[in-house]
């Protein structure tokens, strides 16, 4: 049985499917951990969720975390379902980071028209997962407070943190959220003494920069790192 941790997919279903089926060759004995941001930027947000839902329905061991882009979507959906004269601020913020491609993938023009099953799926996403040697989270944890696991906002939105190992039982943080170069991902994986985190997001949608534009998969048991280049954009 293998464990695979996969960060921000951002609406790239062909890339995800090729990574899982052709490179990882997943089986129902494996465990898959997704770090959030399934939607936006790429053209197939709905298709990404459909594919993951299909894996879940077919008995694969799938664990899904919430990302800030799902939070954008949920907040926009809730705001759009309330009476208003002007477009809600959160909806404008979401549009600035790729809402248009997600709405188009659902065949709708407004957040409130996204089908309820997808909204329910996003609402049910976890904020973090604890493994023996790692804590998985979309963005990071707030170590400035006594209990970093109480701050769910930081889990999907923070952009910087310094791990307090006394609050993680000595475990490193594995996260996505902020795109980093492939060489940096490889560096932090193999230098636990120098880095208290492993950043896995290679910016799958950043296809115009060297060292970027891959969807990553990381095996925390043997430090294997697999990259699939973008096939959707």
Predicted regions and their residues:
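N-terminal active-site segment of His-dependent metallophosphoesterases
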Residues: 1-51
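Residue-level marker for buried hydrophobic side chains located in beta-strands
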Residues: 5, 32-34, 64-65, 135, ...
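Short, glycine/acidic-enriched loop or turn micro-motifs at the edges of active sites
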Residues: 10-11, 40, 71, 141, ...
